[in-house]
C-alpha cells in the first residue's frame, strides 16, 4: 500500500536527534553502534509530561547521575546545536521552571545489548496535544510492532484520572496493534512519598493498574532516580527482551557450580543493568544487585572523568571475596566466593577461561546447547 503524504511527513518528523554515547564509551563502541544485522526490539516509553521518563532514560542509558538531570534539557539542546541538526525537528527537550524535563513529540534512540540485540527506544513526549495525536493520526506508527510498553506514572500527579485515561488508551492501541507486547508500569518519584506510606501507596496503585490493564497483564515497579529501584525495574524489563536468556542462565549456573561460587552476576557493559544471575543460597539484602549496579556505574563515571577506564576490581574480607571483571565484549561479571581455600588467582583464571563460551552464547543466532559442562 502506498503511504500518504501525511504518513511520510510524520515518519520524517519523528527522526530524533542523535544520542550521545555514554561517557567513557567511544562513539561506535559495542554499547552504542548500530549493527548491520540486528534483532531490533521496539520499546515505548510513555507517560504524562514531567513524569520523569527522560531523566530515568538518561540515567540508565547515558550515564547521567541523578543530580545532573535537572539541567538535562539545556544539555540536549546544546548537543542538538553542536551537531547542527535542523532546528525544525519536532523532537527536543526543555526544562520548565521547577526543573522538570519535557520531551516534545517522539525521540528515538538505539541501544545495543548483547551482540545483535538492539533496543529501539521511543521516548514519547507527554503533553496533552501529543498524547492525543498518538491515539489518532500516529496510532499505527507508534503502537505497531511493540515488544515492550513502559508507562511512567508520577506518584504525586494531581491529574491521576487523566493519567489513567491515557494509560488505558495506550492499552487499547497496544491490544489492537501489538497484542503480544509486555506491559510495565513504573510508579515513579517514590522518594517524594513519606517512607512509612510508600508500601501502602504503591500497593494501592499497583492494584488499580492491574485491574485497569485487563485483559493484558502488567508488571509494576516503584522507582526513584535517587536509589537502586530504577535499576531494579529496568533490569527486569531488559531481562524480558533477551532472546536466549534461559541458555544464558543455565550456563551461568554451570559456571558457578564448577568454580564453587556463592553467586555469579552478569551486568550489561554500558548500562550495568543486571541481565542474569545465579546464587546457591539466599542472601539477606534482596536489592543488593541493583545497589551494586548503581555504585559501580557511578565509579565508572568517576574513572571516565579522570581519563581512566574501569576494568576490574576485587573486594576481600574475612567472610568473602568478590571479583568484578570484564567478561565478554558486552558484559561484566561479578563472582562472589566464600571458600577461603580458593586463591584469587584461580578464580580470575576461571573467569578468563569462561569468556569464549559466553561470547558464543551472546549471539542471538548462537548455539542452543549448554556450552559449559563438567
Curated annotation (Swiss-Prot):
Activity modulation comment: The activation of GTP-binding proteins is generally mediated by a guanine exchange factor (GEF), while inactivation through hydrolysis of bound GTP is catalyzed by a GTPase activating protein (GAP). The Ragulator complex functions as a GEF and promotes the active GTP-bound form. The GATOR1 complex functions as a GAP and stimulates RRAGB GTPase activity to turn it into its inactive GDP-bound form, preventing mTORC1 recruitment and activation.
Top-rank EC class of the record's enzyme: hydrolase
Primary residence: cytoplasm
Keyword Lipid metabolism on entry: no
Binding residues annotated for GDP, in chain numbering: 50-55, 69, 75, 188, 191, 209, 225
Keyword Hydrolase: yes
Location of N-acetylmethionine modifications: 1
Similarity-based family: Belongs to the GTR/RAG GTP-binding protein family.
Name of the protein: Ras-related GTP-binding protein B
Organism: Rattus norvegicus
Species lineage: Eukaryota, Metazoa, Chordata, Craniata, Vertebrata
Gene name, Swiss-Prot/TrEMBL: RragB
